[in-house]
Amino acid sequence: MTAPSSQVRRAALPDEEPGDAPLRLLLAGVAFAAGLTGLFLLVWPGSTGRYFSWVLDPPPLASLIGGSYVASLFVFGAALRRPWSEVRGLVAGTLALTIPMLSVTFFHLEVFDFGRWQAWAWVLLFVASPLSFGTILWLRRGSPFADDGPLPPAYRIISGLLAAVFSVVAIGLWWDPVETARVLPFELPSFGGRVLGCWSSFLAFLGGWAAIRARAKEVQVPLLGIAWFMAGAIGGALRNFGDLGPTGRRAAYLLVLGTLLVLSLASWRAAKVSASRL
């Protein structure tokens, strides 16, 4: 005997597990809000005082963060139809972004004009986000991890290297963003630099998850996420190419971003090939 077709279809859908509907809704909300915000930052990087939660200067920084938001649209959008075992790393990674972001926000409240709704929206977002994603992680803490093939050792090392690079960047930006910005082709204000450090800690977590978990299916979303964020950073740099600093520093900046993009894409590809052999 064969199972009814409706049961077969249910078994084939990755979102039929209990609790998946709220997760999909949350991922979709992040993708939509991030994509819209990123579009504004890329199109009008010099006018953030009119529509953003705080004045995000200089324009190259606004475009860089805008590119990160657009990357979030693709990363969280792609996660919508993935099973929990494959998006767990991304969901956990949001805490590495939102908890530090909430901390630096309260450390720099002076940059916000709380007479504007956008300022309140920023604070509420970074209060609600870790609570929402943290609750999902807690409720699904007993869910099994993916049972699949390993990430090839060389790419596990590369993932660890990516995590180390982004960790160093995050620590430097949190500790002294103005001094750390000396290696960049644009200046960083204190709050803007620390916000960028929060994005770096998010990417460090994704790389670390891939290196530690090292399961072919489980690491694909985190590794592809790093690649998307590097592509977004390159897009942001090209958007304000003329505003970037000295030629040598500008070239080195793009070279580093391109190298990180290639390494993350190569690792994602290796994970995908390894998973397809099962």
Residue spans for each PLM region:
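Hydrophobic alpha-helical membrane segments
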Residues: 92-105, 199-203, 222-238
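Membrane-interfacial loop-to-transmembrane alpha-helix junctions, especially the N-terminal start
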Residues: 23-28, 84-94, 156, 217-225
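Juxtamembrane "helix-exit" motif on the non-cytosolic side of transmembrane helices
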Residues: 43-50, 106-114, 173-181, 236-244
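Core segments of alpha-helical transmembrane spans in multipass integral membrane proteins
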Residues: 60-78, 96, 191-211, 228
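Short, intrinsically disordered terminal tails adjacent to the first/last structured region
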Residues: 1-13, 276-278
